[in-house]
Amino acid sequence: MAASVARVLKAAGGRQLLLMVARRRPVLRQPFLLMPRKFWGTSALRSEDQKQPPFSSTSAHAGTPEHAEEQYQQQQPPPRYTDQAGEESEGYESEEQLQQRILSAALQFVPDFGWSADAIAEGAKSLDMSAAAAGMFEDGGSELVLHFVTQCNSQLTELLEEEQKLVQLGTSEKKPTTQFLRDAVEARLRMHIPYIEQWPQALGMLLLPRNIPSSLKLLTAMVDDIWHYAGDQSTDVSWYTRRAVLTGIYNTTELVMLQDSSPDFEDTWKFLENRISEAMTMGTSVKQVASTGEAVIQGLMGAAVTLKNLTGLNQRR
């Protein structure tokens, strides 16, 4: 039903019309009212009991209804608007902000509707918007997945930054690099747990040709942040080696996690710890860098094949 409404709206006016349907309708709560004439009479009577200031053009202007009207407007708070639920907010939000709010609200419906336009429509309805707001997203499912990955990366960066501040303040000890990398990757992958049953579908979308550039950008940015907060200051070829290796470790651990039925994914974290320990003993030769890069590409291709086999499974084995 939501998709049909969205198509009709698109035909009628396109993206802007969808925005008008989804966006909260502003209702001016405090309309300007001209002050009654008796106000001026009362003010004049009161002013007679006070010392009159010297006459000037400014004071003459101040006594006019036009000036009082201007002062009244300046003293009023900014117009406030209400949505369908009667909640107030000031001003408008941009199209991007509106989309981000809808996508964030849609995440709670992923377990029931998957990474789909239906989940987005439910998210819009939870914000008291029209389900037709799902039509704002040309590739709903993929945009929802990319939004989630971006959100998770931001949360990880905040965690790592907070940990760094505690170390700088002396309230926490700096972790060995091996432990730091393991904890960072584990923290990031744990963010998938609420959607673990739907994650094969998400990975399949991330590996679609049209989404690979965005997926790789998010992945490499996340890995770079982890190494940055780990204290990596290398400027030689090892800079590339370390990031390529950690990228491969993250991808393979993510696939292991999808098939892990152990309590709290214990087998996954053990696998991760072993791979991190092995990686820290690697050399930094150019030959190893090249082979590592090839391994990452092969890993992505292998992931696509694995996901093809995993797609459709509703439960982990």
Swiss-Prot record:
Its main location: mitochondrion. InterPro entries: COQ9_C (IPR013718), COQ9_HTH (IPR048674), Ubiq_biosynth_COQ9 (IPR012762). It holds the Pfam family COQ9_N. PANTHER family: UBIQUINONE BIOSYNTHESIS PROTEIN COQ9, MITOCHONDRIAL. This is Ubiquinone biosynthesis protein COQ9, mitochondrial. It is found in: Mitochondrion. Structurally similar to the bacterial FadR protein (fatty acid metabolism regulator protein). Pathway: Cofactor biosynthesis; ubiquinone biosynthesis. It comes from Xenopus tropicalis. Residues 45-97 are annotated as: Disordered. One of its GO terms (cellular component) is mitochondrion.
